[in-house]
Amino acid sequence: MRGVSTPDRRPVLPGLALTLIAGLCLVPAAPAQEADPSEERIEELERRIEQLEERLEAEEDAEPEEALPDDSEADPTTAELERRLEILAAELERQRLGEAAVAAGEGEHGMGPAASKIYRTAEGLSIGGYGEMLYQAPDSTRDDGTPSGRGDELDFLRAVLYFGYKFNDRWLFNSEIELEHASTDQEGSASVEFAYVDWLARPAANARFGLVLVPMGFVNELHEPPIFLGARRPDVEQVIIPTTWRENGVGLFGDAGPFAYRTYLVNGLDASGFSARGLRGGRQKGSGAKAEDFAWVGRLDWVDTPGLLAGVSLYRGGSGQGLTDPAGRVIEATTTLWEGHVEWKKRGFELRGLAVRGEVDDVARLNAALGLEGEASVGEKLEGWYLQAGYDLAVPFAGLRGSLVPYLRLEAYDTQAAVPAGFAANPANDVESWTLGLAYKPIDQVVFKADFQDYDNEAGTGVDQVNVAVGYLF
């Protein structure tokens, strides 16, 4: 219940979260209770890191000298010393955490770090997972001054377990079982997010069979909380690309020179679930999926430059699934989505951008079949984009433990960028937003996030909100 004290009460939880994040950065490491079996290796790595740091300092303090033309034994450059230092630091972290630890960011074949554990397993069973708890505090009023009707919420959003089994070097099974909102009694659910069999033939060509994640954008495949910025996933990758999006299908994946690719044939979307708010309701999620119409999806990424990922993806297929208009004619509802994405990470900087556009055919007849009128039309065109930047303050400030990343994200999307003649677009579906926040990771596998989101739309009904989240993977 909100009263006059609401403005004073609202910042309490976010403020506590920011205080906790700041405090965790300064907490000293707990002393080890007993010697680790790898202690000698750890001491050796620490010694080598110290030597490299001393050489770097000496290199920076020294006067520049002209290199000799035949100086094949010249000392390594500063950049090379820094590269070696990063490699040793990563190895030291792995030794300290143990072999069972998942290195955040090290995914394989389009899967997240924890989801990729099975690929690093010699044989037999692999278990991993992730989870996230989210506090959301929306404003009590909309931009136009009317009540938002929304209250604060604290939700254990997801608890996920990965189960994989490697039969041999060629064949493996991988799956994700997701529990949402903690209890099925409170609008929660239990779902299979993916379940597939891989045939690992060769690096350039492998096969996948089963319930697969559609390879579009960043977050649909890589959605483990410690590996993306923001207490909440980007809106563009929920509204235009309907994350988490999975369908039944078969396909190929692999690495070809400097490129990585994935291409699948999957059951199509179900247009009877489309609405003015997008395609999200058309996902079939592998459950009794209608298969009157199929779709093709393909993705190609440049992965040959360290720290750089750049690529495109395309989805196209029928979504009618046997639906007919009032005249009895079959509706194809051919649906096309294409997107481009780029991510660059270097020395603490993290930049990410994505743009996506979608088209749906036969929308006038689809509206008639679904009984949609006025501003409720399905969009003939949908579009969105976002830009995101973050910087790890632990890079220049060596005293900070873990990772501390302030971030900013700008987004815009419109689920009714075009509608058929005789219909109107709802201005509330033309949205712009910005997100400003802070993410702290004491270790790679655990993250605390807090951010503020400002929402504006053409109807003036945007509702700003504060979010605080904790996430993990293993």
Question: Which residues fall in each region the model found?
Answer:
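N-terminal secretory signal peptides that target proteins for export/translocation
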Residues: M1-P11
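Bacterial N-terminal signal peptides
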Residues: G15-C25
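N-terminal periplasmic/intermembrane-space "pro-region" immediately following the signal or transit peptide
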Residues: A30-E132, D139-D144, F474
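Outer membrane beta-barrel
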Residues: A114-D143, S148-S272, E292-V297, D301-L309, ...
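Outer-membrane beta-barrel pore domains
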Residues: S148, A195-L200, N220, F228, ...
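Active-site glycine- and acidic-residue-rich loops that bind
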Residues: T243, S287-F294, R329-T334
